[in-house]
Amino acid sequence: TAIFQPALPFVLENGNNLIFRPAFSYVFDQPIASASGFSDVSQFGDISYDLLYSWSSSGWTFGAGVVGAIPTGSGISSDNWLLGPSFLAVKPTDWGIWGFFPFHNEKVGGSGDDTSITSLQYFLFFSLNDGWQIGTGPTITYDWNADSENDWTVPFGVQVSKTTAIGNQIVKLNAGIEKNVVAPDDFASDWKFTLQFSPVIGNPFQPNPPSPPVDAATRAAVLAPIR
């Protein structure tokens, strides 16, 4: 899966941040059902997004907001509009960063099957030299509408990331591999390979943000390897 996920932070008058992050994905070799059985296709997936109000306290960065998805109509689209609550807690440390990101997606429109999925992403990354990090950031999901053989997806994996600046543009590059140790019986990929490009884009709707600017902890939260 290749993912482009820009982050657009709005700096508020109180010094906190409103962060919008759409995610555009291209999925390779996704198994889908067809008249002749299952086949693998490579197409654009639905557009997921999160909108978080972010603040810092006692060395933590927190966020609360919503997540959702917009259907693209592709062969692997859910054909649903999704929306639900989310929460973020990030702890930067001397050795790296760790935290968790629980969220829930519920069908609010569309022609696809009913959707009610709760997810928890936990992440733990160790900082190396020159902006490099290594760690893990899998997302565990529970499908409330599935039967007992298909409700849980539990992956484990490893990711390597690099945070750098291209001119004045801060970007995070991330590559990861995951193995589903628990997966739906119907059909699910055993392995997942991900390449992600995440720039922090200067917000065109806020060319002159109020002081203070985005602080280091919030910037770490924006660039954290969350979904």
Where do the PLM segments sit?
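Transmembrane beta-barrel domains of Gram-negative outer membranes and organellar outer membranes
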Residues: 1-109, 113-227
